[in-house]
Amino acid sequence: MIGGDTRAASAHPGMASAQGPVATPSPEQPFPGTTSVSLARPVLRVWHGAHSSGLLPNLIAQHSPAMAQNGAVPSEATKKDQNLTRGNWGNQIEFVLTSVGYAVGLGNVWRFPYLCYRNGGGAFMFPYFIMLIFCGIPLFFMELSFGQFASQGCLGVWRISPMFKGVGYGMMVVSTYIGIYYNVVICIAFYYFFSSMTHVLPWAYCNNPWNTPDCAGVLDASNLTNGSRPAALSGNLSHLFNYTLQRTSPSEEYWRLYVLKLSDDIGNFGEVRLPLLGCLGVSWVVVFLCLIRGVKSSGKVVYFTATFPYVVLTILFVRGVTLEGAFTGIMYYLTPQWDKILEAKVWGDAASQIFYSLGCAWGGLITMASYNKFHNNCYRDSVIISITNCATSVYAGFVIFSILGFMANHLGVDVSRVADHGPGLAFVAYPEALTLLPISPLWSLLFFFMLILLGLGTQFCLLETLVTAIVDEVGNEWILQKKTYVTLGVAVAGFLLGIPLTSQAGIYWLLLMDNYAASFSLVVISCIMCVSIMYIYGHRNYFQDIQMMLGFPPPLFFQICWRFVSPAIIFFILIFTVIQYRPITYNHYQYPGWAVAIGFLMALSSVICIPLYALFQLCRTDGDTLLQRLKNATKPSRDWGPALLEHRTGRYAPTTTPSPEDGFEVQPLHPDKAQIPIVGSNGSSRFQDSRI
């Protein structure tokens, strides 16, 4: 008879659980958990400790569909979710597009092409893809499987080993820093986007009030690198001095003297640039509205934000390759310098770019995967998303260097003279090149709209990471129903913290945060995550978890990478980062020592969470000796495992019958009324008697 059977003993000591009604899947059911089962007289059985474990809301939600996040009455889409408490993606395309939007960000456009040409052109592709295969994809798969198995954000997943929960807090700190300054970059892109809505781009000529005598526009003259100027000295004597003109482009002066009104020092904040402040507000409002219903709303938005940038890239590519000099720029980008492969710096740059561009150790991958259905094939997703991210970087290089080659040809200089990276490429070099094109405002609108969408795709996940971590950690019914208010609170806090970055010294602080807040701290966090899962929790346990979730264990290649290769590469990146460290500069400005010290404090603020929380956990863990406390603090908590009872099979299966003291009365099914409606994937249903 269906119901009343017992399952295998749990591997976690102290976990007591109840037997419950179990529905036998019909032949039409492709995966466990895809059939909706309801009982005429539902019986809710929980084990002792479920109240504090975070699993109780999930159990209640399975029997009480009226409870959903944000307090809304469940829609038809919500009713199809496996996890009614947290919700799931509407479909798997939404998850893939969101993850692509998260991984493919501004760095793919303004950092990778520059690294490629600086490190040997096409030869750089070899170490780049080697690092992708041995480090990027394995780490990506690990984080996706980690979040999907537990259906928890970057804090909740550390039930796997509570002593290392500080890793999750470190991820939250990193995401906070990045979310603050990343939206400022988006707001600047918004500003340029609005400024492009004109007949003549404001950075095209040197006849504006903010321009200096050194300004020389590419539309006014060409080949202005060298020049001569007569100067009269001592009465009748005149000399002709040949000198090098210090050309300042109108786009650079527009950026430095008009948009930023850049101060002379990081400590001289000056005034808040009100136009940038307004654009920052617009940016945060857009992010909040897109996340107002969590993944249910953002999952719909990414159909546009994650795909349209590829349309724009293709349009710019087609336009770029038709320009004179474009081939020279592309060859400069791709021509291999094979001797560079022997340089450690090239391999270090390749490893760092893979690591940072995929968004590993930010917490976003764990968070996005936590909204997947339990049996989703995240192995397939990790390969698709990682390769898409890297292919986008390579493709963006063609777009960037075709235009830069055209500008270099127009000016009569080498491509290296116009190539740049970071904000210098996005807001100075590329906008200047666009002024040379017919209908330049149109191309400018497309370019900055693409930057906005690329930035928003990453920003969505950064904000959702923080919100999900807070909601999962508190875990009570009130905060589950008020998740929208949590999202609003985080967005308002992010806006307020971003205001100093819109001041005249804002760009100094933005680059300081970019260089220190998410640099070596990410490497440390990722390394500790690998070690804690593979060697503290145990690689065999984790491989069994993945097999239970996916139906197959991780391939041998990934097992080897997780245990040996990827940690070694991460350690190499850490050593490389330390060896290659140089004090931060912006153009010719050298940051003062106190500013660099603040940068190091930002970097340490995320890493320090790990030992501090470990010490806290040791102090609150039972044990007669330090070794016993250490053992108890690192073993999985009893609520570690799949969030839903229907997925807690094998060593996670409930085994014992609870008593009424556990919080719920156990009532037997009435043999005449126990019917199970089996709902198929196409919406059809049939009733099956529970008796054999």
Swiss-Prot record:
Keywords: Amino-acid transport, Cell membrane, Membrane, Neurotransmitter transport, Phosphoprotein, Symport, Transmembrane, Transmembrane helix, Transport. The modification Phosphothreonine is found at T657. It is a multi-pass membrane protein. The modification Phosphoserine is found at S659, S684. Belongs to the sodium:neurotransmitter symporter (SNF) (TC 2.A.22) family. SLC6A9 subfamily. Sodium- and chloride-dependent glycine transporter which is essential for regulating glycine concentrations at inhibitory glycinergic synapses. This is Sodium- and chloride-dependent glycine transporter 1.
